[in-house]
């Protein structure tokens, strides 16, 4: 298990374009392997568990495709739930009343995006980076 506060390299900064394709990766969430993703919106990087708040399904309709056509909101391809890319909060659709996306802490430095594990989200192993699915 990685120590809390230990930064783990996720991807080069250039891999995340504003409103573009996200980077998928896997984490241990509460001890179980789970999908996650990172995106860039408004010049900042954000990451979330890849799990709709409405029904526990992955959001992307094609691998890494998380934004709706205007690239303003994240969308669940299954039921159309809409989420704020900067907060993960439900902004409409099927997620209303079900909460939002579970955030994962990221940090950007030296042209890299780093993941900051916490008590619930850990890397799959201490020896392997959280590579894209």
Regions found by a protein language model. Name each.
Residues 52, 76-79:
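Short cysteine clusters
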Residues 1-69, 84-85, 100-133:
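N-terminal pre-ligand scaffold of iron-sulfur
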């Amino acid at each position: 298990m990685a120590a809390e506060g230990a930064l783990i390299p996720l991807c080069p900064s250039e891999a995340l374009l504003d409103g573009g394709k996200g980077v998928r990766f896997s984490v241990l969430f509460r001890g179980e392997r789970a999908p996650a993703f990172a995106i860039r919106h408004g010049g900042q990087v954000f990451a979330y568990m890849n799990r709709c708040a409405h029904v526990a399904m992955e959001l992307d309709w094609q691998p890494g495709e998380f934004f709706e056509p205007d690239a303003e909101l994240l969308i669940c391809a299954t039921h159309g739930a809409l989420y704020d890319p900067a907060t993960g909060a439900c902004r409409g659709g099927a997620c209303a009343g079900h909460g939002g996306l579970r955030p994962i802490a990221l940090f950007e430095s030296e042209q890299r995006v780093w993941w900051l594990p916490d008590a619930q989200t850990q890397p799959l192993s201490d020896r392997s980076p959280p590579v894209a699915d």
